[in-house]
């Protein structure tokens, strides 16, 4: 667990250690509920907002962002309800066929969830959640609404902004290629 906010450097060593332990313990309760033999009837939905989770998964599906399998760059936050919410989303360097050979988009059936390493914690976390029939149903519902109402505006948005990024993209390739 990495903590962005609150900044633990703003606390004494003892306070920071206690805060870190509390956050870690809280997150372990979510993980334990997901790993429970009682899943999906465990209380895991008391810890995480399913709607934000499903929208997060749809974004990763659309972009085929393999980062989800070992999420070192996955943000979650809590609101006043005490539940975890996914986002904001970022770190898409493992998306859109990130490999030089673009293998992820050469095969339509390459799974998003894939054991990249034995420690692919995201793989275990997210595949387990996708076993919940309620999550699957919500995924289908949100996807159907998105694909019929929002896909076309998204594609128009991408086309519009890609024209503005052409020069920047060329400079980026010069620096990073």
Task: Please describe what each predicted stretch is.
Residues 1-70, 74-177:
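Middle-to-C-terminal accessory/interaction subdomains
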